UniProtKB/Swiss-Prot annotation:
NCBIfam families registered for this protein in UniProt: RnaseHI_Halo
Lineage: Archaea, Methanobacteriati, Methanobacteriota, Stenosarchaea group, Halobacteria
Cofactor(s) in the UniProt record: Mn(2+); Mg(2+); Co(2+); Ni(2+)
Record region (As active as intact RNase H): 69-199
Statement: the UniProt record of this protein carries the keyword Metal-binding: yes
Binding site for Mg(2+) 1: D75, E115, D139
Catalytic activity: Endonucleolytic cleavage to 5'-phosphomonoester
Full protein name: Ribonuclease HI
Record-linked InterPro entries: RNaseH-like_sf, RNaseH_domain, RNaseH_sf, RnhA-like_halobact
Amino acid sequence: MPVVECDIQTARAALADAGASFSDGNSEHELWHADLGDAHAVAYADKLVVQGGSPTDITAVVQPDRGGRVHAYFDGASRGNPGPAAVGWVLVSGDGGIVAEGGDTIGRATNNQAEYDALIAALEAAADFGFDDIELRGDSQLVEKQLTGAWDTNDPDLRRKRVRARELLTGFDDWSITHVPRATNERADALANEALDDA
């Protein structure tokens, strides 16, 4: 679910020009709702939360010049390995600003399964925003080595997730993946653990 930090009045004007329908917010924090194509947005003071089957129906309107390169940080967490698991991801623009972030539980999984699910969530979010190039950064050496083909992927479930990640990567003009220390991946790690704490 993309979160777009933007000027809400400008975003509403762009959506109105594109033919979106609007309704009032459901709480004191929600300013308004908008529907366009197969996407639904909820407006807050300085951001839009976009949902639906095709978030780009809205994100492409409010951020028409997105393109470019994004840095995607991802992390998976599992308590019990296997056990309750969650993912966290953060998209950072070239100028260092956070474009979007998310964290969600994924049920019962191993740590490696959660890492792959976090990677896939980050790739899907970056695709929804329409970025051309992606630089992936995660603290799982296994995911990095398997994704690049340096290591075999013997586990059938991880192999399926690797195939899905590679399919998503074909939607980008260029991509790379870098193994980073946990401290560098702190925000994605925190989002995954917050999702587990809130479950």
